[in-house]
Amino acid sequence: MKTTHTSLPFAGHTLHFVEFDPANFCEQDLLWLPHYAQLQHAGRKRKTEHLAGRIAAVYALREYGYKCVPAIGELRQPVWPAEVYGSISHCGTTALAVVSRQPIGIDIEEIFSVQTARELTDNIITPAEHERLADCGLAFSLALTLAFSAKESAFKASEIQTDAGFLDYQIISWNKQQVIIHRENEMFAVHWQIKEKIVITLCQHD
């Protein structure tokens, strides 16, 4: 499968992007993965996204001196070396990965359409959060995409990932660089940026 790697500094970390072309994917490409047999029953989309995500993860791990491919955990999560944390996300034909010494979460999302935002609002934010989003100065579809992505990154950065849902992560404030999220007795600072029609969020949880 044809891929292209680029990197971008963001919030004190290096994000590793892998653009991939699913059209020229073949099953033999998966043999690069030590755990390729675990994907034999997956659909083509899942296989291409997984492969691209692991390629991005390998680039990210190289920064820390590792030459391994993250395995698949019991909950289908990437298994990182014991001394580091990492996160992988996908959007369209883009995969993204980051590695850190502290718990970290990354997410990449295409900005919602107005219709999609309208349909998903009640599943992502509370009425109180809706008021905060309405006052943030962004188009609502963009603001809701950012809220969704920020909560995804906060969830991924949680060391103990429970069955908490989007409404359990409450946005209490935000500015042009960060979204502040509260869940139970924890606070999460989520960095964000817009890249063309894409929202990228990153949460490092100390």
UniProtKB/Swiss-Prot annotation:
The EC number(s) this enzyme carries: 2.7.8.-
Entry-linked Gene3D superfamilies: 4'-phosphopantetheinyl transferase domain (3.90.470.20)
Superkingdom: Bacteria
Pathway listed: Siderophore biosynthesis; enterobactin biosynthesis
GO molecular function: holo-[acyl-carrier-protein] synthase activity; magnesium ion binding
Catalytic activity: apo-[aryl-carrier protein] + CoA = holo-[aryl-carrier protein] + adenosine 3',5'-bisphosphate + H(+); apo-[peptidyl-carrier protein] + CoA = holo-[peptidyl-carrier protein] + adenosine 3',5'-bisphosphate + H(+)
Statement: the UniProt record of this protein carries the keyword Magnesium: yes
GO aspect biological process, one term: enterobactin biosynthetic process
Cited Pfam families: 4PPT_N (PF17837), ACPS (PF01648)
Assigned GO CC terms: enterobactin synthetase complex; membrane
Compartments it resides in: Membrane
Binding site for Mg(2+): D107, E109, E152
UniProt entry keywords in alphabetical sequence: Enterobactin biosynthesis, Magnesium, Membrane, Metal-binding, Transferase
Required cofactor names: Mg(2+)
Record family assignment: Belongs to the P-Pant transferase superfamily. EntD family.
Known role: Involved in the biosynthesis of the siderophore enterobactin (enterochelin), which is a macrocyclic trimeric lactone of N-(2,3-dihydroxybenzoyl)-serine. The serine trilactone serves as a scaffolding for the three catechol functionalities that provide hexadentate coordination for the tightly ligated iron(2+) atoms.
Miscellaneous field: Deletion of the C-terminal 25 residues of EntB results in very strong decrease of the catalytic efficiency of EntD.
SUBUNIT field: EntB, EntD, EntE, and EntF form a multienzyme complex called enterobactin synthase.
Descriptive protein name: Enterobactin synthase component D
UniProt source species: Escherichia coli (strain K12)
Gene: entD
